[in-house]
Swiss-Prot record:
Species name: Penicillium chrysogenum (Penicillium notatum)
Entry keyword set: Acetoin catabolism, ATP-binding, Ligase, Nucleotide-binding
GO terms of biological process kind: acetoin catabolic process; acetyl-CoA biosynthetic process from acetate; penicillin biosynthetic process
Signal peptide bounds: none
CDD domains: ACS
Protein's name according to its UniProt entry: Acetyl-coenzyme A synthetase
Gene Ontology terms for molecular function: acetate-CoA ligase activity; AMP binding; ATP binding
Residues involved in ATP binding: G404, E405, P406, D428, T429, Y430, W431, Q432, T433, D519, R534, R545
């Protein structure tokens, strides 16, 4: 008897996993490896991973003692919980970040190269050894100390991508001060807000910066910000270009004049494992940037471990991360990870397109770079520029890393074939400012990879896929939902500076007992993770997180604007692009007003946050309670007018057709 018609198989939830091949580590990777990977194979990863989840204290204690040098050993590996927001690691231990990054290598081999400075102009770079680095860090640390900086004080850093930025980080940590770096593309308003929030009294900057053949007026921006920062008593200025810059006597001091006064060595200050190492401000969905606080031992361990196992860093490697020190990628993977492991790190001041599109490949060949780490935005730009720019051997490359957003399959393949010559292993890494270091990632030379997937969890990371409606964990494979983590790990941020409740509400109270990432994700049939992007009001432009609320607040500062709504939509080059909708208090929309509003955002936040398009509309789609329905704006911009869903809850459904008309006519121009 028939059981009725045969049901067609259910389509896969994580369909991308069935649209790509699985790539194994190329044989050429192993053939050219100087000594072999740190772990044998995927089976050893699974064994270590299981230990890290089932016996985390044993696992992390062993790793900490192996990779970090403590002045005083710890007894308690971990204390606290997600529920209470009081996680602490290696509790009784004492150490110094600067000693771990510099002295222990300098004492062994002072002539070993620590920093390869690749200046904006290709012929202007230089190399700094670990011995020289220890001397420079000590002298800047003396300078800070003599200007009254004490352990626990915050120091603001607003520097371009020059070796002195790395020296400034380490000089702060040498005396137990907390560095608070602000990306040197942020506006004076953004800098002011961060300096005030962190209570920094000393700022380190340069006369100017250089990037892509252009000049950045860093000192001018600092001066503008300082007008509203009365507590700042010292601005230490590094001479990068030698340009004439405004000068405030008594407050401003030249780096080159000041550091000469001090000895070549300052003993590092021993700090507690849980003492703050740095603050880094990141965009939050409420709009006000939050100072994410990382502590010393746990953060350093995350950096060292991921450097060792994800990037397969060995002693004589020359490692090149194209990130800026103003973001977490630069903190962890330009400064801390490579220096903790004693290899050479490239500090790259320029852009991938200056003086031409072969700049990255020139650098890789020139210095025999072994690991290269960059955002998909740069890769998309270079792929589009054409393969004629890649006439380089680049046989030294073992690892090609990707950071900031998922990498599209066709870009992944181009990276593997054209850049890596099918000899290097691609590591598409997922992590956040708040996680401190990689959390879902392949291990270099070990993990089979799927283009577009971040692969498998790093040691100690236990991911959970949560149903956003019920708040329950979804078990099994081929599922999707929001991504959370089930147990603490050493490099996670401990708090938001001066706002612990905000930290709890953003990360730990959303789903009790879990750390909430704010990202959607799928777990495929093999247990591999696919990151879907933000589920809160944050857009990801060129791998940088920007708060829509912060951009909206900048637009509302313009006297003509009544209301503003900002959404991110897919962009071929930058991943997402900022698009803004505004309604005016009065008057007719003009092309000039759109330009003025984009300029307003540039001034208020920085050029990278400027909207790609500004649409002036009569009204925004709002619910009867006044909530702006950004979902509708997103769908209109994506050409999905046919699937807007139920618009009957809007206070005035007719505004939708008018917005569609505005968008269409703007795009036809």
């Amino acid at each position: 008897m028939s059981d009725g018609p045969i049901q067609p198989p259910k389509p896969a939830v994580v369909h991308e996993a069935h649209e790509v091949d699985t790539f194994h580590v190329p044989k050429a990777f192993h053939d050219k490896h100087p000594s072999g990977t740190h772990i044998k194979d995927i089976e050893e990863y699974k064994k270590l991973y299981e230990e890290s989840i089932k016996s985390p204290d044993t696992f992390w204690a062993r790793m900490a003692r192996e990779l970090l040098t403590f002045d005083k050993d710890f007894e308690t590996t971990h204390h606290g919980s997600f529920e209470n927001g009081d996680n602490a690691w290696f509790v009784e231990g004492r150490l110094n970040a600067s000693f771990n990054c510099v002295d222990r290598h300098a004492l062994k081999n002072p002539d070993k190269v620590a920093i390869i400075y690749e200046a904006d102009e290709p012929n202007e770079g230089r190399k700094i050894t670990y011995g020289e680095l220890m001397r420079e860090v000590s002298r800047v640390a003396w300078t800070l100390k003599e200007r009254g900086v004490k352990k626990g004080d915050t120091v603001g850093i607003y520097l371009p991508m020059i070796p002195e930025a790395v020296i400034a980080f380490l000089a702060c940590s040498r005396i137990g001060a907390v560095h608070s770096v602000v990306f040197a593309g942020f506006s004076s308003d953004s800098l002011r807000d961060r300096v005030l929030d962190a209570s920094s009294k000393v700022i380190i900057t340069s006369d100017e910066g250089k990037r892509g053949g252009k000049i950045i007026g860093t000192k001018k921006i600092v001066d503008e910000a300082m007008k509203q920062c009365p507590d700042v008593h010292t601005v230490l200025v590094y001479k990068r270009t030698g340009a004439e810059v405004p000068w405030t006597a008594g407050r401003d001091i030249w780096w080159h004049e000041e550091v000469e006064k001090y000895p070549n060595y300052l003993a590092p200050e021993s700090v507690s494992s849980e003492d703050p190492l740095f603050l880094l401000y990141t965009s939050g969905s409420t709009g006000k940037p939050k100072g994410v606080m990382h502590t010393t031992a746990g953060y350093l361990l995350g950096a060292a471990m991921t450097g060792k196992y994800v990037f397969d860093i060995h002693d004589d490697d020359r490692y090149f991360c194209g990130g800026d020190v103003g973001w977490i990628t630069g903190h962890t993977y330009v400064v801390y990870a490579p220096l903790l492991l004693g290899c050479a790190t490239v500090v790259f001041e320029s852009t991938p397109a200056y003086p031409n599109f072969s700049r990255y490949w020139d650098v890789i060949d020139k210095h025999d770079v072994t690991q290269f780490y960059v955002a998909p935005t740069a890769l998309r730009l270079l792929k589009r520029a054409g393969d004629e720019h890649i006439h380089h051997k680049m046989h030294s490359l073992r690892i090609l890393g990707s950071v900031g957003e998922p990498i599209a399959a066709e870009v992944w393949k181009w990276y593997f074939e054209c850049v890596g010559k099918e000899e290097a292993h691609i590591c598409d890494t997922y992590w956040q400012t708040e996680t401190g270091s990689h959390v879902i990632t392949p291990l270099g030379g070990i993990t089979p990879t799927k283009p577009g997937s971040a692969s498998l969890p790093f040691f100690g990371i236990e991911p959970a896929i949560i149903d956003p409606v019920s708040g329950e964990e979804i078990v099994g494979n081929d599922v999707e939902g929001v991504l959370a983590f089930k147990q603490p790990w050493p490099s996670m941020a401990r708090t938001v500076w001066g706002a612990h409740k905000r930290y709890m509400d953003t990360y730990l109270n959303v789903y009790k007992g879990y750390y909430f990432t704010g990202d959607g994700a799928g777990r495929d049939h093999d247990g591999y993770y696919w990151i879907r992007g933000r589920v809160d009001d944050v857009v990801n432009v060129s791998g940088h997180r920007l708060s829509t609320a912060e951009i909206e607040a900048a637009l509302l500062e313009h006297p003509s604007v009544a209301e503003a709504a900002v959404v991110g939509i897919a962009d071929e080059l930058t991943g997402q692009a900022v698009n803004a909708f505004v309604s005016l208090k009065e008057g007719k929309p003009t092309e000039q007003i759109s330009k003025d509003l984009a300029m307003q955002v540039r001034k208020s936040i920085g050029p990278f946050a400027a909207p790609k398009a500004v649409f002036v509309v009569d009204d925004l789609p709002k619910t009867r309670s006044g909530k702006i329905m950004r979902r509708i704006l997103r769908k209109i911009l994506s050409g999905e007018e046919d699937s807007l869903g139920d618009t009957s809850t809007l206070s005035d459904p007719s505004v939708v057709d008018k917005i569609i008309e505005t968008v269409h006519s703007a795009r036809q121009k």
